[in-house]
């Protein structure tokens, strides 16, 4: 799901170039609006969107992921703010919701989660069978 038209175009070109257009579908629009309308099951879901919406994206991802599927959440440490006490007012909501995401994936007995401290952080959650 991508809302920026230029990125949609680039993604479609890349998908076609590697010959997987029959396996990948790009939805153009706002993920908050599109996700609730999807009923398919997916092997993998990659979240890289509005940081303040990560708990919502997790809820929707858990609904759509296959058993043994993997959910990736990019930028989970958000410039180091998630792991520090200091948060600029501008980032408070995003940081609070990223912390909530980490709490949810860490405490969910149906998930095995690792937080990778590479770049801006990546959460990798595998659905247990």
What are these regions (language model features)?
Residues 1-129:
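S-adenosylmethionine/decaboxylated-SAM
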């Amino acid at each position: 799901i991508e809302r920026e038209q230029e990125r949609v175009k680039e993604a479609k070109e890349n998908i076609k170039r590697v010959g997987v257009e029959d396996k990948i579908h790009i939805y153009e629009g706002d993920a908050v609006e599109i996700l609730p309308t999807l009923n398919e099951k997916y092997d993998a879901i990659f979240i890289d969107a509005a940081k303040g919406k990560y708990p919502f994206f997790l809820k929707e991802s858990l609904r759509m992921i296959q058993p043994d599927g993997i959910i990736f959440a990019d930028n989970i440490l958000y410039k180091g703010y998630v792991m520090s006490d200091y948060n600029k007012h501008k980032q408070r909501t995003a940081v609070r919701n990223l912390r909530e995401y980490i709490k949810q994936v860490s405490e969910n007995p149906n998930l095995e989660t690792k937080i990778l401290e590479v770049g801006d952080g990546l959460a990798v959650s595998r659905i247990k069978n």
